[in-house]
Amino acid sequence: MDVLPTGGGRPGLRTELEFRGGGGEARLESQEEETIPAAPPAPRLRGAAERPRRSRDTWDGDEDTEPGEACGGRTSRTASLVSGLLNELYSCTEEEEAAGGGRGAEGRRRRRDSLDSSTEASGSDVVLGGRSGAGDSRVLQELQERPSQRHQMLYLRQKDANELKTILRELKYRIGIQSAKLLRHLKQKDRLLHKVQRNCDIVTACLQAVSQKRRVDTKLKFTLEPSLGQNGFQQWYDALKAVARLSTGIPKEWRRKVWLTLADHYLHSIAIDWDKTMRFTFNERSNPDDDSMGIQIVKDLHRTGCSSYCGQEAEQDRVVLKRVLLAYARWNKTVGYCQGFNILAALILEVMEGNEGDALKIMIYLIDKVLPESYFVNNLRALSVDMAVFRDLLRMKLPELSQHLDTLQRTANKESGGGYEPPLTNVFTMQWFLTLFATCLPNQTVLKIWDSVFFEGSEIILRVSLAIWAKLGEQIECCETADEFYSTMGRLTQEMLENDLLQSHELMQTVYSMAPFPFPQLAELREKYTYNITPFPATVKPTSVSGRHSKARDSDEENDPDDEDAVVNAVGCLGPFSGFLAPELQKYQKQIKEPNEEQSLRSNNIAELSPGAINSCRSEYHAAFNSMMMERMTTDINALKRQYSRIKKKQQQQVHQVYIRADKGPVTSILPSQVNSSPVINHLLLGKKMKMTNRAAKNAVIHIPGHTGGKISPVPYEDLKTKLNSPWRTHIRVHKKNMPRTKSHPGCGDTVGLIDEQNEASKTNGLGAAEAFPSGCTATAGREGSSPEGSTRRTIEGQSPEPVFGDADVDVSAVQAKLGALELNQRDAAAETELRVHPPCQRHCPEPPSAPEENKATSKAPQGSNSKTPIFSPFPSVKPLRKSATARNLGLYGPTERTPTVHFPQMSRSFSKPGGGNSGTKKR
């Protein structure tokens, strides 16, 4: 068919459409030729008579019934292209008749332009002309060069009416041509959508045919994109989940669009402004955290394992990979960068065809949404949980293999002597979980697994691991030692990666058929190990150097590179991910080589990590105890004892009693082991119950006058002037001067009010009895003042901070000599001696709760002292308080007939702490 343009004196295009034979090959040629002065007859399609005309809808429907379709995919595709081309040609003929219905030269010209315009690649040049007169085309071109409306109006005002009518007629004609083309494309779109919908219905019928015929399966409706509406996405999600379960899985042509649809829906659900996120994550400015992460990312790029990211020619691809990893580290600063991300990002970039933004979307959806929380955080807590859960699932599904591996582990522990062999599956499952099997299985199999992970969740990871161990179980059961097991697994790992040891369709069939979804008891196991597990040390993550052990880890890795290389070679079956366990295994070797450093490495010892890192694998105790209890049972008891001894020693060193000289002399520190623990005496609260007086006296700074450091015997008799300047008299004088301030303190008003009444009587007491106080009761107060809170020093309420004594040379070295001779294990003997030598002191000094009967008798003694002659005593007598019946029944006043005696030897000094001396001081 030859179509020749008309119109005198202007160039045209010659279009030749030639159909050769019945094969249906078409050739379109366009070339410039000289103008033809005469108009040829109307164009005629050669071969149109042999093929009857059909409607446009019937051509699309007859594509599937072409005779050549049975000859193969290529013949079917050629027939489809030919049918589409013929459909376009017949459509052009109909539009030609509709657009150029007139007769004569004008009608032929319009029909010619309509046909020629359909063969153009783009309609943008239609406005420029070439089909109408040269003058009209020049005018339209000049109009297009003036974009503003003002300039166009000025240009058109210069034209006469005939020229304007010609321009208007030409514009209307070309608008009609473009409208016809648009209508034709819309009709073609409708036909294609109808065909797609018909194919989707076929897929829906197939899915329902292979389903379990449940009620929810009847609602399956397959679509390529989520439809609008409330349940549109969920319907699409369920259908694609069913497609992923088929043996063929999701086609690779759909994978990119399917993954992006899932990621976009997640980002929309959390209300993320993606444009703003892209500007933040991919900006060229360097953040403070970028340097450390960038260094680690560059170190791991050569270990990616993908061929497209290795070699000198892949430099640009590595730059893109680094940008994606750095962008995710900026997005999720909690996770940052973890070793193994480079493998995940490389595979995602391959699916996303190198698009950085799309790859970042998939990483966010995979790590933040699909995988468990804290799967890649600093301590890999969720990873350790899944490793412990996997061992339990292995015992449930493959009991023989699990028992065989436990036997190999116990044998290795016995033969190694002081070493420790972790569970044999840990070395491999850690690598599988962190890289999602990208380093141990072929690429196509990994992508199918990832499709299932995106739709089914992280449960697929455990299922695939069980399926792999089940496949390799026959060869593993032949191993007799742990070394043979590692050698066999290294060989099998290479075969799985290179020789397709596992068929993808068989593997996925095993994954979906081993148990119903969700996996029974999986949620309970994860919850149990989540709250009963110690995660990996924080130093496992290379880029986050935090904590006090990180520096030691870094120094070990820097100082001992040979040891690290040896460990990496020992676990060479890990491939590009073999360096991940090197730091931990290196520490175990150091622990064996240097037993003297056991205490310093105890915090990083893998033997003390709970089920997430290691497990004793004692199957005989599994029925009675869970894994957490087994870990605690295997803990070294001697180590716990040594640790307890160190803690106790530190506490004893922190507890000390400080004796300060009253005249600003040197400070003498006495440890609690040098004094006897007896009740402290608060001189301002004499006569009160011990429960009410212990708080104010604890950790008190006791002032001892005249400490010269010499050792002399105590003087039995002193003159009256020296006795009046004793510490007790000084306390009385100070409180008489500060009476208003002292009475304002709770718990002290009653006692201070009685000091005046007995001050004169106390001055006339004998000298020998007056000497008994500093040697007996003062020492007792000093012994009681120590407590675990000894680092805090408090002054007794109402006491002057710097009391001034009349005689500053009073020597109390005898008190120190006696304190040094006392022992903690002679508490009772010392108490009895003091009772015999100093009866007045016993009368007024309360005893610890360990002697309730004596305390009860002592509390009753002051009641009878009012009617009898006052017994010689340096202490003022205090009127006892009326006791409350309710408090007595509750045991607040000590043991009675209704409240039995309870001894707390270690809590005797803190027994009365809640009372604090503030309650029970008001007279009733």
From Swiss-Prot:
Composition skew (Acidic residues), residue ranges: 555-564
Transmembrane segments: none
Keywords noted in UniProt: Cell membrane, Membrane, Phosphoprotein
Keyword field contains Phosphoprotein: yes
UniProt membrane topology term: Peripheral membrane protein
Basic and acidic residues compositional bias, start-end: 47-59
GO CC list: ciliary basal body; cilium; cytosol; nuclear body; plasma membrane
Region spans: Disordered: 1-76, 94-134, 541-564, 776-806, 838-924
Compositionally biased residues, Polar residues: 858-870
GO molecular function terms attached to this record: GTPase activator activity; small GTPase binding
Cell location: Cell membrane
Free-text function comment from the UniProt entry: May act as a GTPase-activating protein for Rab family protein(s).
Name of the protein described by the UniProt record: TBC1 domain family member 30
This protein's encoding gene: TBC1D30
